[in-house]
Amino acid sequence: MRDETGETQDLEAEEIHPLFHGAPGSTEFRKLRKRLVRETRAAIETYDMIRPGDRWLVCLSGGKDSYTLLAVLHELKWRGLLPVELLACNLDQGQPGFPATVLPEFLTQRQVPHRIEYQDTYSIVKEKVPEGRTYCSLCSRLRRGNLYRIAREEGCQAVVLGHHRDDILETFFMNLFHGGRLASMPPKLLNEEGDLNVLRPLAFVAEADCDRFARAMNYPVIPCDLCGSQEGLQRMQVKRLLDEWESRSPGRRRVMFRALMNVRPSHLPDPKLFDFTALMPDMSDFREKDVPILREH
């Protein structure tokens, strides 16, 4: 929100979005909140995510990351720094034990425009996935298809996800170790149909900060393993590896993420990324000069 002079109010202004009602008053929390807002805003600007007047479908699973995403985006909008319309969306996929009333009550109490949709994709996944295999891959594909459909129905131009810096790093190493390719989650992506952007505004945010924020705000976090399926073994192994590196060398994740933003195609052996055939030395000037012959003694 801006004052009469047009200046953006400081984050510590008394007027706050209802999503921040009950926020701790500690210096530590204020620093965390400012850091989340600063890093999210930086990602939005770096990857040119904003097109004024657009409508964003903000996906809310009930996990710590999506709560953080929702709160920070509304904070930016509240401060006049995000000129888009926000619509929160939860897709209830029919997982057993999913608390169907938690998110509608949470969003209504905090005056957040939202849409709750029920689609029993859980039964489809149970039917299609062999026993002992993880549900995550098929479940995410079905969820993505439904979210794209909802975005179109609601007139949204972007689907906004809560993936953070750690998710991006983990995906990079999973592709490196198990997929044989250098790829991860881009902060901004155009879907195959070309009608929707997929945005990840938390791309610069650490998972630990999302966890601290959601805990401090006492948001009603819903566990992600209600279906009985755990995260894929590969991702868990990569997460443990990154944790070990971080404990041995604090700040390692930050350095690795900076490397993902500093790619040099000419220093990688992929001929599709760089025209190595054009790297031919020009010997014309060299041949015209008298070059002394070195003789062995």
Swiss-Prot record:
Binds 1 [4Fe-4S] cluster per subunit. The cluster is chelated by three Cys residues, the fourth Fe has a free coordination site that may bind a sulfur atom transferred from the persulfide of IscS. GO terms for biological process: tRNA thio-modification. Its main location: cytoplasm. It comes from the Bacteria. A motif (PP-loop motif) lies at residues 61-66. Gene3D superfamilies: HUPs. Pathway: tRNA modification. It catalyses: cytidine(32) in tRNA + S-sulfanyl-L-cysteinyl-[cysteine desulfurase] + AH2 + ATP = 2-thiocytidine(32) in tRNA + L-cysteinyl-[cysteine desulfurase] + A + AMP + diphosphate + H(+). The thiolation reaction likely consists of two steps: a first activation step by ATP to form an adenylated intermediate of the target base of tRNA, and a second nucleophilic substitution step of the sulfur (S) atom supplied by the hydrosulfide attached to the Fe-S cluster. Catalyzes the ATP-dependent 2-thiolation of cytidine in position 32 of tRNA, to form 2-thiocytidine (s(2)C32). The sulfur atoms are provided by the cysteine/cysteine desulfurase (IscS) system. This is tRNA-cytidine(32) 2-sulfurtransferase. It comes from Paracoccus denitrificans (strain Pd 1222). The gene is ttcA.
